[in-house]
Amino acid sequence: MLNELVFFTVILIALFTVLFAIFLYLVVRKRKDGKWKREVETYKQLYEPVLFRYLAYGDEQVPAPSSSAQHVAMMELLDHFMRVLANGGIKERATTLAEMYFVDYLRAQLAHRRLGRRMNALFFIEDFYLCSLIHELEAMYEQKQLTTMEKRQLLKMFALFQHPHVYEYMKQTDESFTQFDYRLILSRMDDHMFTKMVDHFFDWNEKIQYALIDMIGIMQKLAHVSFLRTLLRHEQSEYRIRALKALAEIAFPLDSAQLRIHLHSPVWQERLMGLRLCARIRQYELVETIKELVKDRVFSVRSQAAEALLRMPNGLAILEQIAQTSDDRYARDMALEWLERGREND
């Protein structure tokens, strides 16, 4: 019994010692982090007027940072000013200063054991457009222990820097990459690089293909409207649906005969996107077809049809007629709902 009590006491003391050590570590770490942040803020106050004058007028001598806190303070300030005072001259001066003072520091940070430090370095390299570090970025991308987060950021940077191997890198991505990831990468490409992606559309995996179609609409890339129109004839419905969505984003006016094909599609998502395009381009000759779709069996299609009618020149009158005379209860309800919305915004 005594031995068990001693053993239990030893375990309690050991646990208390471990917990106390963790507590001390956290206290010391918090104080150290607090001291670091205060130091960075102090340097920011010193650098702020100098950096502002340098970026605004280009005739100020900026003292070189010598410590880690000075580097971070100057980089954060420079990044802030680039976002607030966005114009070509300021960005060019910021990149020149970053090339002069930050390259060695950021190169060292890319090899840091902590992920947060490495990611911050990548963000700063992107923001300052430090193409001189491209070889280090290539070497980093080839590392086996690279995290998915780092790989995503590197691909965005390769696209921004117009790296010639970005196509090969994108073909090697794994399933962890989402369509949203690919959208971010595509959004950083220039027109030439984006066009090359579109030209080789069917070489890419489905996620990249869908992201490409979406970005044509989101980025209003009118040069690729003809490509979207070819997809409208594709046998795979998802291509047609996304192409219609992109055309709706651009508000590109398809002819009525073409639109009727999609409005009569057996795929409800295709009818929905066709109606979304109708709502943007307001082709009055399609009113009767759209009125029929207010009776559609799918709620979202009925709702989009009612919105498309509301956007017509006499949309309120059309919806009032449906609300009063339609033989379909769901169509009457939908017309009343959009009538109320229309009158609120009238």
Give a label for each model feature.
Residues H80, N87-L97, M119-F128, E150-F161, ...:
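Structural detector for internal amphipathic alpha-helices that build alpha-solenoid repeat scaffolds
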Residues M1-F7, D328, L336-D346:
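Short, Lys/Arg-enriched, disordered terminal segments
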Residues R113-R114, Q143-T147, D174-T178, W204-N205, ...:
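Short inter-helical turns and helix N-cap capping residues of alpha-solenoid HEAT/ARM repeat scaffolds
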Residues L26-R114, M119:
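N-terminal topogenic membrane-targeting module
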Residues F23-D33, E142-W204:
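Long, contiguous interaction/recruitment modules in multidomain scaffold/adaptor proteins
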Residues L316-T325, R332-E340:
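Leucine-rich solenoid repeat scaffolds
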Residues L97-L110, L130-E142, H163-T173, D191-F202, ...:
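Amphipathic alpha-helical scaffolding segments comprising HEAT/armadillo-like alpha-solenoid repeats
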Residues M1-E39:
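N-terminal signal-anchor transmembrane alpha helix of single-pass membrane proteins
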